[in-house]
Amino acid sequence: MQLEKMITEGSNAASAEIDRVSTLEMCRIINDEDKTVPLAVERVLPDIAAAIDVIHAQVSGGGRLIYIGAGTSGRLGILDASECPPTYGVKPGLVVGLIAGGEYAIQHAVEGAEDSREGGVNDLKNIGLTAQDVVVGIAASGRTPYVIAGLEYARQLGCRTVGISCNPGSAVSTTAEFAITPVVGAEVVTGSSRMKAGTAQKLVLNMLSTGLMIKSGKVFGNLMVDVVATNEKLHVRQVNIVKNATGCNAEKAEAALIACERNCKTAIVMVLKNLDAAEAKKRLDQHGGFIRQVLDKE
């Protein structure tokens, strides 16, 4: 696909005079364009749901969720991956973010990195990619060689693959088994795909990882019951989670958390089923960590 024919490279009539307007009007133009992004994502919800189901199936069988991208797309994948361990208590290697150019590229532009097909393949090899893993290629343009080669290699291994781009019919979309293509239109600043396209990608990644965690029993109601208390704010959040899930007071919630080494799931089952920490943990283990199953089946 030629660059000049891509929707993400088009000229946006709404911002054609943005360099001549007031600061407030400038903000209004950008905000009005940003409002269209959730609607674009809404149109591809069935595709996102299908991807979540596949990701969950693979991860449940021992696989990992691997994001691969360049520039903004790569950084968004790393951001999403890095938030999963503290929010949901998963091991750091379960959700992985890869970026063209490596760690240095998180904060700096690395010349030519996104054009390296070899780089995409090697980065996946270096993390020991297996057929059980799911590889999600992220590229606003849908034409990034680093990402396309990574998806091709993943498919050769037998991996399930997902391609996220903002240009219909792009190479990323056609290479991946599942395509998620929120069409956000031309950017306010022509070609600046870190804007609407980047926002759309972030919304999609939010759904992929959150959907995976919900389906994996990491959420009870709408509470993040596997949150790791790495700071004072999260200690307080744990207490509030146990309170909200059980209706108990703060003192009882804190006592239960202390008794089970600050595991919200165990504390919730302790309070709701009137169990000690060991028995509550045992029942959770018997039901794969799903609080709902412990409560519904016992």
UniProtKB/Swiss-Prot annotation:
Pathway: Amino-sugar metabolism; 1,6-anhydro-N-acetylmuramate degradation; Amino-sugar metabolism; N-acetylmuramate degradation; Cell wall biogenesis; peptidoglycan recycling
InterPro entries tied to this protein: Etherase_MurQ, Glucokinase_regulatory_CS, MURQ/GCKR, SIS_dom, SIS_dom_sf
Domain (SIS) ranges: 55-218
Catalytic activity: N-acetyl-D-muramate 6-phosphate + H2O = N-acetyl-D-glucosamine 6-phosphate + (R)-lactate
Lineage: Bacteria, Pseudomonadati, Pseudomonadota, Gammaproteobacteria, Enterobacterales
Transcription in keyword set: no
NCBIfam families listed in its UniProt record: N-acetylmuramic acid 6-phosphate etherase, PRK05441.1, PRK12570.1
Catalytic EC class: lyase
Active site: E83 (proton donor), E114
Keywords from the UniProt entry: Carbohydrate metabolism, Lyase
Enzyme nomenclature, EC number: 4.2.1.126
Any GO BP annotation: N-acetylmuramic acid catabolic process
Family: Belongs to the GCKR-like family. MurNAc-6-P etherase subfamily.
Record keyword Lyase present: yes
Protein's name in the database: N-acetylmuramic acid 6-phosphate etherase
Species this chain originates from: Escherichia fergusonii (strain ATCC 35469 / DSM 13698 / CCUG 18766 / IAM 14443 / JCM 21226 / LMG 7866 / NBRC 102419 / NCTC 12128 / CDC 0568-73)
Induction: Induced by MurNAc 6-phosphate that releases the repressor MurR from the DNA. Repressed by MurR in the absence of MurNAc 6-phosphate.
